[in-house]
């Protein structure tokens, strides 16, 4: 199983726009071969040091059956369309691809 944690920094006041676009793509992604889990998450204040909060970051939590499935996901037509739609409201992306130790 492959785990992905993607942190997406969204420009200033564009968080709701980003989430609307992202959520409109959820069904297509979740129907992909190998998708086990896929959802967006935002920071909440849990008052736990050394927690850092950032209201302009959306964290995407993903689980895939294999690296091949993840690769297919990244090249799927609906993902290419999604990337085009969000390109002007995203400032940066950081991705971690993990497997159980």
Predicted regions and their residues:
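Short conserved AdoMet
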Residues: 30, 65, 91
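Short amphipathic alpha-helical segments
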Residues: 14-40, 78-86
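Short, well-ordered beta-strand segments in beta-rich or mixed alpha/beta enzyme
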Residues: 2-9, 41-74
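Generic structural motif
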Residues: 11-13, 67, 100
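Residue-level marker of intrinsically disordered, low-complexity segments enriched
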Residues: 3, 8, 34, 59, ...
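Absolute protein N-terminus
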Residues: 1-2, 101
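Glycine-rich beta-strand-turn "strand-cap" elements at beta-sheet edges
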Residues: 39-56, 81-101
């Amino acid at each position: 199983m492959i785990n992905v944690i993607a942190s997406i920094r969204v420009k200033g006041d564009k968080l709701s726009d980003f989430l609307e676009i992202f959520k409109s793509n959820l069904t297509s992604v979740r129907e992909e071969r190998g998708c086990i889990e896929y959802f967006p998450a935002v920071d909440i204040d849990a008052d736990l040091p050394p927690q850092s909060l950032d209201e302009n970051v959306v964290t995407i939590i993903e689980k895939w059956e294999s690296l091949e499935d993840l690769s297919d996901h990244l090249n799927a037509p609906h993902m290419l369309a999604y990337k085009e739609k969000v390109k002007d409201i995203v400032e940066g992306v950081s991705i971690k691809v993990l497997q159980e130790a």
